[in-house]
């Protein structure tokens, strides 16, 4: 089995993020255009309709270390959010509590993580949680 080099995978993800494919509820790209290692990413999720997250904008930071895509990136919300997989002190997504991170394969991508987090917002257990005021940050 051929392994695709890390930078090729990340360049493909960058191109995909810049094209903004999908329904517009998630977006992502490099935090800095000068990041030649393609390590630090930012993402945005628009909360799902008919949930406490409805039309709120959630910002995240993702860090892809040298082992990406063989290991998942670290993911941290910068916008305060109350869902089961997010540490309420620092916004870090706990890999053990988000299936895409706990069952990571090298075929998963940043877009998949953001989509999975958006789906988590719609889960019945998370829909019941009281949310911080809009615009609050970690």
Curated annotation (Swiss-Prot):
InterPro entries: UBQ-conjugat_E2_core, UBQ-conjugating_enzyme/RWD. Keywords: Ubl conjugation pathway. Residues 5-138 form the UBC core domain. GO terms for cellular component: nucleus; ubiquitin conjugating enzyme complex. Pfam families: UQ_con. Has no ubiquitin ligase activity on its own. The ube2v/ube2n heterodimer catalyzes the synthesis of non-canonical poly-ubiquitin chains that are linked through 'Lys-63'. This type of poly-ubiquitination does not lead to protein degradation by the proteasome. Mediates transcriptional activation of target genes. Plays a role in the control of progress through the cell cycle and differentiation. Plays a role in the error-free DNA repair pathway and contributes to the survival of cells after DNA damage. PANTHER family: UBIQUITIN-CONJUGATING ENZYME E2. This is Probable ubiquitin-conjugating enzyme E2 variant. Belongs to the ubiquitin-conjugating enzyme family. PROSITE patterns: UBC_2. It comes from the Eukaryota. Gene3D superfamilies: Ubiquitin Conjugating Enzyme (3.10.110.10). GO terms for biological process: postreplication repair; protein K63-linked ubiquitination. It comes from Dictyostelium discoideum (Social amoeba).
